[in-house]
């Protein structure tokens, strides 16, 4: 039996054993898919977290990284790159003129493995490609039922196919573990029903699925900048009692709900003592992220205000603003919260942060407020 490769001199996790059924050719590259425009910030995060990786190909919506020699991460490797929708082991590309049998070429590259699902998605969501037809052909080639659900189950070994162009596909694989790794391309499969009042409903729906936010019926939540009420609508559906804070009008479908209250004013005009008793503070305001943090900090600085969690969308006026992300996360920790962040597939140039109360006592930030507030 040949000697095992020497341990990699890297901080990357390394698989100590190969899970049964995994591909023999595990691939020497990582492919990370992301929003168009987020590539540089994804790479910035990679340098901070995994500097041993070496950047390879760069396309709008996808970046590849070469693994160090001897490094073989676990099958479910999904580092916290924030801007990565999904992360797969890349086996390379297949390319052929239009009309050629790319499916056969893709299956040859994939090789034999205990595949349980197939994920197909376009690198460019605007591209005129039929991902469903391609997936059906790949399933047939693997002897799998064509009606197999596109979403994988945790533990499934997934064959990945990212459509770069109609003539070129990227082939790879991963083992599903996190919610996003169960969705093709890391794109949330949920749809927004016609009775929802704004896209904020869908973003919060994805956040709940991504972070497993522990909302519970009977809890109280307030939303800063609530109009027209999409997030409030989703909170109400989760069984919470909701206060929406916004001088603008709330959609009647939300405003008429018996568990909804509208404070028709700006959040900074609310007396701080009124925030006592809320379990959750939610914010998706279209303002600078520093201003969002100031609004939240003003609230958590108040004695007696200690929500169990914060769900905040941090807008990025420019992608480069994300370089301040480590400082923003430090701010949450200084408040006594443990933050998790991710750029949601249903959002735009923004990141979503779930910050849960840590349970440890911390010094309160000072808040500047007018007398009587």
Spans of features found by a protein language model:
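SAM-dependent transferase fold signal centered on methyltransferase-like domains
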Residues: 1-373
């Amino acid at each position: 039996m040949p000697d095992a490769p020497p341990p990699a001199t890297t901080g990357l996790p390394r698989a100590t054993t190969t899970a049964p059924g995994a591909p023999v050719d595990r691939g020497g590259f990582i492919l990370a898919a992301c929003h168009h425009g987020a590539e540089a910030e994804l790479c910035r995060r990679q340098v901070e977290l995994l500097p041993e990786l070496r950047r390879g190909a760069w396309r709008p919506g996808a970046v590849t990284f070469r693994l160090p020699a001897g490094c073989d991460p676990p099958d479910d490797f999904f580092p916290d790159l924030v801007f990565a929708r999904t992360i797969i082991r890349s086996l390379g590309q297949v390319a052929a003129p239009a009309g050629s049998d790319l499916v056969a070429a893709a299956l040859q590259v994939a090789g034999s493995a205990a595949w349980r699902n197939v994920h197909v998605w376009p690198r460019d969501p605007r591209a005129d490609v039929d991902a469903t037809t391609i997936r059906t052909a790949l399933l047939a080639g693997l002897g799998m039922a064509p009606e197999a659900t596109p979403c994988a189950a945790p533990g499934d070994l997934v064959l990945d196919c990212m459509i770069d162009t109609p003539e070129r596909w990227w082939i790879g694989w991963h083992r599903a573990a996190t919610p996003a790794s169960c969705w093709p391309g890391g794109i949330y499969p949920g749809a927004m029903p016609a009775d929802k009042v704004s896209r904020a409903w869908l973003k919060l729906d994805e956040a709940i699925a991504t972070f497993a936010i522990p909302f519970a019926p009977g809890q109280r939540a307030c939303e800063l900048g609530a109009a027209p009420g999409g997030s409030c609508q989703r909170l109400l559906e989760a069984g919470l009692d909701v206060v929406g804070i916004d001088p603008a009008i709330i959609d009647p479908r939300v405003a008429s709900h018996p568990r909804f209250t509208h404070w028709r004013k700006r959040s900074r005009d609310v007396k701080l003592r009124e925030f006592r008793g809320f379990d959750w503070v939610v914010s998706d305001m279209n303002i600078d992220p520093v201003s969002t943090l100031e609004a939240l900090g003003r609230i958590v600085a108040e004695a007696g205000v200690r929500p169990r969690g914060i769900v905040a969308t941090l807008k990025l006026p420019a992608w480069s603003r994300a370089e301040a992300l480590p400082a923003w996360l430090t701010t949450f920790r200084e408040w006594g919260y443990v933050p998790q962040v991710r750029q949601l597939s249903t959002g735009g140039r923004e990141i979503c942060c779930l910050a849960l109360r840590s349970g440890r006592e911390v010094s309160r930030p000072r808040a500047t407020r007018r007398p009587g507030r």
